[in-house]
Amino acid sequence: MREILHIQGGQCGNQIGAKFWEVICDEHGIDGTGRYAGDSDLQLERINVYYNEASGGRFVPRAVLMDLEPGTMDSVRSGPFGQIFRPDNFVFGQSGAGNNWAKGHYTEGAELIDSVLDVVRKEAENCDCLQGFQVCHSLGGGTGSGMGTLLISKIREEYPDRMMLTFSVFPSPKVSDTVVEPYNATLSVHQLVENADECMVLDNEALYDICFRTLKLATPSFGELNHLISATMSGVTCCLRFPGQLNSDLRKLAVNLIPFPRLHFFMVGFAPLTSRGSQMYRALTVPELTQQMWDAKNMMCAADPRHGRYLTASACFRGKMSTKEVDEQMLNVQNKNSSYFVEWIPNNVKSSVCDMPPRGLKMAGTFVGNSTSIQEMFRRVSEQFTAMFRRKAFLHWYTGEGMDEMEFTEAESNMNDLVAEYQQYQDATADEEYDEEEEEERDAE
């Protein structure tokens, strides 16, 4: 069975992760004690992807929880599904990272990382055929960003051929937690570009907008935002957990979505959007679902896909529906909006269909797109970074932990290169490349 090992780090990562497990347990019919109480064989058919079956028929999540302070983990442990995790898999320090990337990556985090890696190894040995890792973290704080990226690079060393998928919450433009977010995020992106295979980009502002505009919630709480994220996470992985007509795994997803190795930052969307309390009263049709999925207002990161072009995209539909209709709708989207897709990658939209819809819905869809417009987000963080770094503001917190200014400069230029690469492929056309080759051939003669 192709297992996925889930790792969550820092406050944000642990809160999203806890929500994710609530959703997954619900879909697979696992109750708060880890016992199966569902009603469909489909729920158990590929349950090994995320769960290890322990003695007495209990299902234990393949999850590692880490943080540099005990607070968030205590609340996970006392939450509705806190009892199903392996107690040894909670790894935490006492000092906290104080929103400082350097503490998470070099000092405090580095002291704790070996005990995290021990747990990761133990979980990996429990797998028949480990498919890859998924990491939940935010890039604005200290633990999720600093220690999260440290762990990713260590896992990369030890398991170089396994997929590394991250769900990364970027700092949002208007809603800021910490003044040093741009530093932490830039240093993290510097790591993610090199060491992760696929990054699902989320950000609080886009989630706020969705809650506000689409779900009509006056004051969205983090619980509501995390509910949206967990719906998306569950959708991205549903093809792996349930049988379906067109299945995919992490590697297939990567092969279809990543035309160039560095450009692996994806926008995600989910349809139909519902708030936690309300369920949809009428079933959506495949065309409606498709339309909502591709809607720019549905994207969970603050970048507008209409400002760029899609290099590739993938859609996972869930529920009983005709594959033919799905294919027709996806083709329809591409034909009507052909200017938003690069023409030098033909058939760049892949769809998969999975039989099990999420709880309480007849059908749903998850969208993952590799769009050049995501550069808007990197650009925004980069501008904030430069504004502070030019004056060396707050740098002493980082140099005090043994970091060098050089590292900041490198991270900054790596992020700017990334933006430039996205721009280059946004402007590229099929003919232009071809002309250049012809000219080169002529010169060679």
UniProtKB/Swiss-Prot annotation:
Mg(2+) binds at E69. The keyword Methyltransferase does not apply. GTP binds at Q11, E69, S138, G142, T143, G144, N204, N226. GO terms for cellular component: cytoplasm; microtubule. Keywords: Cytoplasm, Cytoskeleton, GTP-binding, Magnesium, Metal-binding, Microtubule, Nucleotide-binding. GO terms for molecular function: GTP binding; GTPase activity; metal ion binding; structural constituent of cytoskeleton. PROSITE patterns: TUBULIN (PS00227), TUBULIN_B_AUTOREG (PS00228). One of its GO terms (biological process) is mitotic cell cycle. Residues 421-445 are annotated as: Disordered. SUPFAM superfamilies: Tubulin C-terminal domain-like, Tubulin nucleotide-binding domain-like. Its main location: cytoplasm. InterPro entries: Beta-tubulin_BS, Beta_tubulin, Tub_FtsZ_C, Tubulin, Tubulin/FtsZ-like_C, Tubulin/FtsZ_2-layer-sand-dom, Tubulin/FtsZ_GTPase_sf, Tubulin_C. Its cofactor is Mg(2+). Residues 429-445 have a biased composition (Acidic residues). Belongs to the tubulin family. Tubulin is the major constituent of microtubules, a cylinder consisting of laterally associated linear protofilaments composed of alpha- and beta-tubulin heterodimers. Microtubules grow by the addition of GTP-tubulin dimers to the microtubule end, where a stabilizing cap forms. Below the cap, tubulin dimers are in GDP-bound state, owing to GTPase activity of alpha-tubulin. Dimer of alpha and beta chains. A typical microtubule is a hollow water-filled tube with an outer diameter of 25 nm and an inner diameter of 15 nM. Alpha-beta heterodimers associate head-to-tail to form protofilaments running lengthwise along the microtubule wall with the beta-tubulin subunit facing the microtubule plus end conferring a structural polarity. Microtubules usually have 13 protofilaments but different protofilament numbers can be found in some organisms and specialized cells. PANTHER family: TUBULIN. This is Tubulin beta-4 chain. It comes from Triticum aestivum.
